[in-house]
Amino acid sequence: MIETTDSLRDCLAPAKLNLFLHITGRRPDGYHTLQTVFQLLDWGDTLHFTRRDDGLITRRTEIADVPPEHDLTVRAATLLKTHTGSPEGVDIEIDKRLPMGAGLGGGSSNAATTLLALNRLWKLNLPRLELQALALKLGADVPFFVFGKNAFAQGVGEALDVVQLPPRHFLVVTPRVHVPTAAIFSEKALTRDSKPLTITDFPAELSCNTEWPESFGRNDMQQVVVGKYAEVAQVLRWFENVAPARMSGSGASVFAAFRSKAEAEAVQAKLPAEWNSAVAASLDQHPLFTFAS
């Protein structure tokens, strides 16, 4: 990251993985309650912010099918400006790397990076908990990225506890299909009654078991997505004799964990050419974690 008085450049908006995802119920308002462990990665979109004196908030990058007014970075900046009454404006540029509709939290992470970066650039000095409350207005995953640590999440994803996870390298494979999260959550076949866990149920498994992630929990959305999207099923089948693999979030991305970058890259080299893939290392905290207290 490069910081000047009027700009913040090369701000990573890290991807996340759901190491498991259990859906434990559905609230009267239609939102689902869940339990998951979020893992940060050192791979994601890169954002650039330049302060404006005229108070305008603009996105300088064209993104197909995402008009600026619907972009979570613009919405996050607008929400923060309205909440604080700040006279400042900003130009936002996005180097897009994460595929959309992939279960990697790309839009949510961009929103959180915007909140954290502007908290610094606009000299707002809002505490982290206040930013997390704003983040929840933008989406269920956004508070996690503002929280900024690998976490056990509950509720709709806003109740967060830090978890210590081992260093890993992940191979993330994304077939060329977009999976709409809302549509999967509305599927009648979706399991909504997983038995709730406590935080003490899983850390030793996640840290020590060499067969992880297959050895602990599951992704309750995976079976539904596999039944609707043959491309996701194909990726999971490919991994069956290679390494334990699991879908992240509502898909379409599938991931496998490895002890070293070399192991992950050796498997990546064997993938079919038509699949997007990346090898990424685990992160312990968000790169902009210190921009809130």
From Swiss-Prot:
Biological process (GO), any one: terpenoid biosynthetic process
GO molecular function annotation: 4-(cytidine 5'-diphospho)-2-C-methyl-D-erythritol kinase activity; ATP binding
Chain residues that bind ATP: P99, M100, G101, A102, G103, L104, G105, G106, G107, S108, S109
Pfam families: GHMP_kinases_C, GHMP_kinases_N
Keyword Kinase among record annotations: yes
Gene3D superfamilies: 3.30.230.10, GHMP kinase, C-terminal domain
Catalytic activity field: 4-CDP-2-C-methyl-D-erythritol + ATP = 4-CDP-2-C-methyl-D-erythritol 2-phosphate + ADP + H(+)
Metabolic or biological pathway, per its Swiss-Prot or TrEMBL entry: Isoprenoid biosynthesis; isopentenyl diphosphate biosynthesis via DXP pathway; isopentenyl diphosphate from 1-deoxy-D-xylulose 5-phosphate: step 3/6
Keywords: ATP-binding, Isoprene biosynthesis, Kinase, Nucleotide-binding, Transferase
Catalytic site positions: K16, D141
InterPro entries noted in UniProt: GHMP_kinase_C_dom, GHMP_kinase_C_sf, GHMP_kinase_N_dom, IspE, Ribosomal_Su5_D2-typ_SF, Ribsml_uS5_D2-typ_fold_subgr
EC number: 2.7.1.148
Domain of life (superkingdom): Bacteria
Membership in a protein family: Belongs to the GHMP kinase family. IspE subfamily.
Function, in words: Catalyzes the phosphorylation of the position 2 hydroxy group of 4-diphosphocytidyl-2C-methyl-D-erythritol.
NCBIfam families in alphabetical order: ispE (TIGR00154)
Name by which UniProt lists this protein: 4-diphosphocytidyl-2-C-methyl-D-erythritol kinase
Organism: Paraburkholderia xenovorans (strain LB400)
